[in-house]
A protein has these predicted regions:
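N-terminal membrane-proximal hinge/A-helix region immediately C-terminal to the signal-anchor transmembrane segment
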Residues: 1-45, 56, 60, 83-91
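Residues that form ligand- and interface-recognition hot spots within folded domains
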Residues: 5-7, 16-17, 53, 223, ...
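A generic structural signal for alpha-helix starts
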Residues: 17, 56, 73, 237-238
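Short clusters of hydrophobic/aromatic residues that line enzyme substrate/ligand-binding pockets
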Residues: 30, 49, 208
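Cytochrome P450 heme-thiolate monooxygenase catalytic core
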Residues: 34-42, 76-253
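Short gly/ser-rich anion-binding loops that grip negatively charged ligand groups
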Residues: 48-51, 72, 76, 107
Length: 255
């Protein structure tokens, strides 16, 4: 079945046989996707593994993610880190129980996942249970994910892109830049440490910096930041989608 959604032609596959043809026989032809307006923010679509068409650049990025993020060995070695972060959450809940302090369940869960992600990527904690820093980072990360995935009239009627009636392009640029500023600070800090110490961190940033130095013309600092953005979004989505509404609508628990 073929549908016309605004200016976009859409094909709906409704049978198993046709789906098999599309996904197996003609997968290269159908592997591309329409790039949303928000994905054009800071030229993200030109260097992002999510939006690039199948090409040598896309294959190289996928290989880097496979080796440095989703490799079985790396996932196995992070088991101790997961246990550590869950223990920190348990200790926080225990302290709150003893002091009879209200607990924002969504906020505590987000802080746990955020620190697990940041330790995996950058070997440092981003947030603390007793501070408001996790709330700000939560808004930035969800701001990026929400605007990139939001229904945007401009994607179906390109003539509206100039006026941006829903403000999605404006908001996407704001949150993208906020996250990139954080990445810049982290990268600068790591480069300073690398310049004064021979000890290396065993995290994604270290691996990407090594690759960037060896392949400066193929994978520069801008590419590095965009790949970090994709990594944060992928891991965050997998970990947080189960309690998204809890995070957005805080639930307080009194002990």
């Amino acid at each position: 079945m073929s549908l016309k959604l605004g200016s976009k032609a859409t094909v709906v596959v409704s049978s198993a046989n046709v789906a098999r043809e599309v996904l197996q026989k003609y997968d290269q032809m159908f592997s591309g996707r329409s790039v949303t307006g928000a994905a054009h923010t800071l030229d993200h679509h030109m260097v992002s593994m999510v939006w690039l068409p199948v090409s040598s650049q896309w294959r190289n990025l996928r290989k880097m993610c496979k080796e440095n993020i989703f490799a079985t060995q790396r996932l196995d070695t992070s088991q101790g880190l997961r246990q550590e972060k869950l223990q920190e959450l348990r200790d926080y809940l225990h302290r709150s129980s003893v002091s009879r302090k209200a607990v924002n369940v969504g906020g505590a869960a987000f802080t746990t996942s955020l620190n697990l992600i940041s330790r995996t990527l950058f070997s440092k904690d981003f947030a603390d249970y007793d501070s408001d820093s996790s709330q700000e980072l939560q808004e930035i990360v969800w701001g990026v994910m929400k605007n990139v995935g939001a229904f945007n009239l401009s994607d179906y009627f390109p003539v509206l892109r100039v006026i941006d009636p829903q403000g999605i392009m404006r908001d996407a640029k704001f949150y993208f830049q906020k996250l990139f500023d954080i990445f810049d600070d982290i990268i600068n800090e790591r480069l300073q440490v690398r310049g004064t110490s021979e000890t290396k961190k065993n995290d994604l940033l270290e691996a990407l910096l090594d690759h960037s130095i060896k392949n400066e013309f193929e994978f520069g600092r801008n590419d590095l930041k965009h790949l970090l953005l994709v990594s944060v979004n992928l891991i965050t989505f997998n970990k947080l989608v189960g309690y998204k509404h809890t995070c957005l609508k805080p639930l307080s628990m009194y002990n």
